[in-house]
């Protein structure tokens, strides 16, 4: 199998897991999670620098999920890396579950931020990139790492997100934003 074939199959597994856990919970948003599967799989498989045996490694790259309702995508890719079990995924959105509807920070399991209101994850990513800039200035290039953020078109519309984006651009931060614009808000 080619590397592309493996990546595509892994992304399909993320889609299947994401849709399955939302269906089992009878609650959640499967669309965004399924749409972001290719991105998150490629990020974790090809670009994100981290040490699974040392989740708090100071030089790890950071990934911030702004739209918390896309948590099925994050939980699914983390399950493929061994951070969540299938039984834990089946508890999605249940009271006291390790997989709530919006992720809560748990660096040991690969979750860098608690996702709440849209724009919050975006601003946390900007803050992490500012911290990375400080660490490099203070301790040297060996502290350099990348910060990634997945932001939604709805999140970009939030003023807090717009302000964070302006600051990030002004400071020229080592920050990579990924957005999958649907040009569509939640429809009922």
PLM region descriptions:
Residues 1-8:
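Basic/polar N-terminal segments that are highly enriched at the extreme N-terminus
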Residues 2, 23-24, 111-112:
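Short coil/turn segments at secondary-structure junctions
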Residues 11-27, 179:
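N-terminal capping segment at the start of a domain
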Residues 17, 38, 185:
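Active-site phosphate/pyrophosphate-handling residues
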Residues 30-33:
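Conserved phosphate/pyrophosphate-binding and hydrolysis machinery centered on Walker-type P-loop NTPases
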Residues 35-171:
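Cofactor-binding active-site loop characterized by glycine-rich and histidine/acidic residues
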Residues 176-188:
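Single conserved hydrophobic/aromatic residue that forms the stacking wall/gate
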């Amino acid at each position: 199998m080619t590397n592309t074939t493996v990546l595509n199959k892994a992304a399909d597994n993320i889609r299947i897991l994401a849709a399955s856990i939302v269906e089992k919970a009878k609650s959640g948003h499967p669309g965004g999670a399924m749409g972001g599967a290719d991105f998150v799989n490629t990020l974790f498989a090809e670009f994100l620098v981290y040490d699974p045996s040392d989740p708090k490694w100071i030089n790890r790259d950071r990934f911030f999920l702004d739209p918390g309702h896309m948590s099925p995508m994050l939980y699914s890719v983390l399950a493929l890396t061994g951070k969540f079990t299938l039984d834990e995924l089946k508890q999605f959105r249940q009271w006291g579950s390790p997989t709530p509807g919006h992720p809560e920070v748990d660096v040991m399991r690969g979750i860098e931020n608690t996702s709440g209101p849209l724009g919050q994850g975006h601003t946390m990513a900007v803050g992490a990139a500012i911290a990375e800039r400080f660490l490099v200035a203070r301790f040297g290039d060996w502290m350099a790492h990348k910060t990634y953020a997945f932001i939604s078109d709805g999140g970009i519309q939030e003023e807090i997100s717009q302000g964070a984006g302006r600051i990030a651009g002004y400071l020229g931060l080592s920050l990579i934003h990924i957005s999958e614009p649907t040009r569509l808000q939640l429809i009922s």
